[in-house]
């Protein structure tokens, strides 16, 4: 399995391979690289899709130190550099979008486009931080995981039980404490609203109409704050991971966007 060492982390990724233009994707909190299985199937082999496991998720390993989304962005660039790729389109869902934005800020000339699903440039409010801390503390704690896992599946994934089952199986059989440092990273995400105007590449933004993580105004504010051309789409009936439950619609939007980039 492919791994790259990056500042105390052994970062796992999946690479569809090929010589097509590269698209680097980061998953939402609690998820892993398999969140993008549908997109890899739809985009490859015309595009080279690279899906990265963030620290605290999937097969990526890391030391016990704290980290930020800037560190995750550097992890992602380490993967890109390891693969010998110069220019990429970067994207992600939720926290994966946080990472993508910071990738674009770290290396602007190397990013040809952004694909952001359920994402914002703002820090969380005090109310949001308290709410997320309650959820992650319950997840990491010693109480029954099944109840909280089913609640998280309903909120993040939405859809129906068939969409939930593969992820519930992963969560209930895994190490529930692995997300502790990742939870701190998420809850303490910094506000980059005053920086995103420097991102001038084209951007595709998508929000599930029932996404509990970010409301319409938050994503609209991000769309308008970016320094380049940006389009914002809402997927009716979708929650935080529309690429999972409404894959055909997301795949089509991504293919159209990538086509307009000439990639």
Residue positions per predicted region:
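Conserved HGGG/HGGXW glycine-rich cap/lid loop of the alpha/beta-hydrolase fold
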Residues: 7-65
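Gly/Ala-rich beta-loop-alpha elbow adjacent to hydrolase catalytic centers
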Residues: 92, 96, 100
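Active-site loop/oxyanion-hole signature of alpha/beta-hydrolase fold enzymes
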Residues: 37-41, 50-91, 252-255
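Conserved alpha/beta-hydrolase catalytic His-Asp/Glu region
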Residues: 125-130, 142-197
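Catalytic histidine-centered segment of alpha/beta-hydrolase-like enzymes
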Residues: 238-251
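Flexible "cap/lid" loop of the alpha/beta hydrolase fold
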Residues: 101-106, 111-141
